[in-house]
Regions:
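Active-site microenvironment for binding and transforming phosphate-containing groups
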Residues: 1-155, 160
Length: 161
């Protein structure tokens, strides 16, 4: 379904070879949740090797917003909830638990993007922001909705006219 040069990965909380405390899962990739930073670093290294990534993922500081940033090989950090790249070999990454990752690429595999889609981001338009930034005709886009932990998902009642 996706171009051969595009790879989307969703990781489990637990994996053989992972490091970290059980309360975070042994394959925690998040530095901001209180897990040991050396365990997270080891898991990030394992992620690159195990999944044969072409480069280290470009992580964003997720803020439950609709902000989308473009990343390339020189990208270091930004506060956003979506990122995209047109640079071959660049890996865009988001962290999710009770939010859903939304993967987007064009049919030719020349642009890839990912959104951290929680209810605040969805209401705020994070997916729309990503699609607008990617700037590809809708009939040329491919979308994959990643897994979400529905047992921890909180959805408030929202009415919008």
């Amino acid at each position: 379904m996706f171009p051969d040069n595009v790879k989307f990965i969703s990781t489990p909380r637990f994996i053989e070879g992972g490091a970290g405390a059980d309360c975070f899962g042994n394959f925690n990739l998040a530095l901001h949740v209180g897990d040991e930073s050396n365990a997270v670093s080891a898991n990030r290294e394992f992620l690159e090797k195990h999944y044969k990534l072409p480069s280290s993922p470009k992580w964003i500081n997720q803020t439950h917003s609709s902000v989308c940033v473009r990343v390339d090989s020189k990208f270091s950090s930004a506060s956003a909830d979506a990122s995209y790249s047109r640079t071959s070999g660049v890996v865009c990454g988001v962290l999710t638990a009770d939010c859903m990752p939304v993967f987007i690429c064009d049919k030719r595999g020349t642009v890839v993007g990912i959104a951290h889609a929680g209810w605040r981001g969805l209401v705020g338009g994070v997916i729309e922001s990503l699609i607008e930034e990617i700037d590809v005709e809708g009939n040329e886009l491919l979308v994959h909705l990643g897994p979400v932990s529905y047992t921890h998902l909180t959805l408030p009642t929202i009415c919008r006219v």
